Swiss-Prot record:
Gene: secB
Organism this protein belongs to: Shewanella denitrificans (strain OS217 / ATCC BAA-1090 / DSM 15013)
Superkingdom field: Bacteria
Annotated Gene3D superfamilies: SecB-like (3.10.420.10)
Descriptive protein name: Protein-export protein SecB
Keyword Kinase: no
Keywords assigned: Chaperone, Cytoplasm, Protein transport, Translocation, Transport
InterPro entries: SecB (IPR003708), SecB-like_sf (IPR035958)
Organismal lineage: Bacteria, Pseudomonadati, Pseudomonadota, Gammaproteobacteria, Alteromonadales
GO cellular component: cytoplasm
Role: One of the proteins required for the normal export of preproteins out of the cell cytoplasm. It is a molecular chaperone that binds to a subset of precursor proteins, maintaining them in a translocation-competent state. It also specifically binds to its receptor SecA.
Main location: cytoplasm
NCBIfam families: PRK05751.1-3 (NF004392), PRK05751.1-4 (NF004393), secB (TIGR00809)
UniProt-recorded Gene Ontology molecular function terms: unfolded protein binding
Amino acid sequence: MAEVANNEQQEQAPQFNIQRIYTKDLSFETPNSPAVFQKEWNPEVKLDLDTRSNKLSDDVYEVVLSLTVTAKNGEETAFLCEVQQAGIFSIQGLTEQQLAHSLGAYCPNVLFPYARELVGSLVGRGTFPQLNLAPVNFDALFAQYVQQRQAAAAEAPAVEEANA
């Protein structure tokens, strides 16, 4: 009897498993080489992030973290590095809100070190000085995203009423 109750508790308990982490796409461009190597190196580096998720089957999701790193030396683009790091995750027993947080913050947090290492490797292979991307607070980014959606949803009825 206790064994049956134990099994039911395990089925209801939240479960999170990483099935696979992989590189979905990557690109490294040096549009102004070799001239860029002959100039004094004083880059301005810009990082753009994006995440998306797809439901593959019951309780199985693909999450893709996209990083675009652009380094400009003066007005010229020194390099452009684009990486899509993806993972397949099995997630069970979460509320809709918890699932959204897992897909929008926790999974990207798992993927980021892999993407950061890949970007660093590509930049090094391009013979540029080492690039270490700072950690990203995906929880804060997700909270900001949720606030923006809530604000947009609150404004939408007001706009509809004004148009009526």
